[in-house]
Amino acid sequence: MRERTVTYSPAFTLVPTRECFNRCGYCNFRADRGAAWLQPAEVRALLLPLVGSGVVEILVLSGEVHPHDPRRGEWFAMIEDICAVALELGFLPHTNCGVLSFEEMRALQQLNVSLGLMLEIDSNRLLGGVHRHAPSKIPALRTAQLEWAGALGIPFTTGLLLGIGETPAEREDTLRTIARLQDRHGHIQEVILQPHSPGGSQSWAGEPLGDAQLLGVVRLARQILPAEITIQIPPNLVGDPVPLLEAGARDLGGIGPVDVVNPDYAHPVVERLGERLAAAGWRLEPRLPVYPHLDKRVATALQPLLGEHRARLCQAAVT
């Protein structure tokens, strides 16, 4: 059987804060105002043991402080500081901290090899459903974020959250929105297809998205999205990943100790996952948090460190 390749990112997630002004009905991550903010000493204490461990990506994943909150500047400075420490220790940051201003995106571009924001579903209808109390989930705000990332030339990850009350037509519309943005800017490296997976902290009583439904969305996405966009599926949220790979998915995302967004669903052990995939003819390989064809879009100051990681990854692939 010919072996095919599927990738993952050896990652560790840092959460600056779970405080978030959104109250999405399906969320198992957020906390109210007053939740702890990560302190500088904590960042170093968490990252230092990871040096030399094989972890490359530091995923900075944060709750959102409202743009008009007087603490917004302090919140954003904390995120910048976390990225700077990660770079200092030799890691490659990727930040997803919600909807940002153009200037905030420009600032993070200097400290991250890529950024991310889930488009989720490009439909205002859900503002009367699971996004009723989530002001930053207005689709126009999120598509603007993807547009700005393209204008700035930032390698970008986005995705759909599936099974949150959307229709099949809305899924297709969302994929076509992403495809149009990619046609304009060429900056989108991957699209995550994330099935809603109920957790113990959410307020919405929605059912999980079935594997058969997800399989159909993967096939549709591969038909609609440009070929250079990789389709990602989260291995801890699906039953058997192999049919999804056969349908066109080629990445399993960042795999680390804990899935902080879906804490009820443990990440698989990479070695066991690799064995399982190998039995089906797939080779599991690590990747960086920016895809090779977008390396040149990464900020000049980050190119030496990125080059070191790219060379190390290429060397490992031939030994």
Swiss-Prot record:
[4Fe-4S] cluster binds at C20, C24, C27. InterPro entries: Aldolase_TIM (IPR013785), CofG_family (IPR019939), Elp3/MiaA/NifB-like_rSAM (IPR006638), F420 (IPR034405), rSAM (IPR007197). It is an enzyme of class 4 (lyase). GO terms for molecular function: 4 iron, 4 sulfur cluster binding; 7,8-didemethyl-8-hydroxy-5-deazariboflavin synthase activity; iron ion binding; transferase activity, transferring alkyl or aryl (other than methyl) groups. Keywords: 4Fe-4S, Iron, Iron-sulfur, Lyase, Metal-binding, S-adenosyl-L-methionine. PROSITE patterns: RADICAL_SAM. It catalyses: 5-amino-5-(4-hydroxybenzyl)-6-(D-ribitylimino)-5,6-dihydrouracil + S-adenosyl-L-methionine = 7,8-didemethyl-8-hydroxy-5-deazariboflavin + 5'-deoxyadenosine + L-methionine + NH4(+) + H(+). Pfam families: Radical_SAM (PF04055). SUPFAM superfamilies: Radical SAM enzymes. Its cofactor is [4Fe-4S] cluster. Residues 6-236 form the Radical SAM core domain. Pathway: Cofactor biosynthesis; coenzyme F0 biosynthesis. Belongs to the radical SAM superfamily. CofG family. Catalyzes the radical-mediated synthesis of 7,8-didemethyl-8-hydroxy-5-deazariboflavin from 5-amino-5-(4-hydroxybenzyl)-6-(D-ribitylimino)-5,6-dihydrouracil. This is 7,8-didemethyl-8-hydroxy-5-deazariboflavin synthase. The lineage of its organism: Bacteria, Bacillati, Cyanobacteriota, Cyanophyceae, Gloeobacterales.
